[in-house]
Amino acid sequence: MEIEFKLERRIGALSDNPSGYTKELNVVVWDGKYTKYDLRTWNPNGKPGKGITLTKEELKKLHKLIGEEIRQMGGRNE
C-alpha cells in the first residue's frame, strides 16, 4: 500500500545535489487527513524520500532549539 500525500505549500529548499534531489521544508497532507510540516528529501520527479513530519508545536520547539544552538555557536565555524 502506497502512502498518499498532497503538497499543500512549499516553504523552501535547504539544499540540493547534482542528481536533482532536494531537501525541503513544506506543508504536506498525509493520507488525506494529517497536515504536517515536513522536512525531507524529494527526488526530481516529486517523490518523497526519508524525512520527518512535525506538528506546529514541534516546529516552534525546533525553532527555539535551533536558535539556542546558533547563539551558543557564536562566531565558531562548524
Language model features: what each stretch is:
Residues 1-78:
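Positively charged, low-complexity terminal tracts
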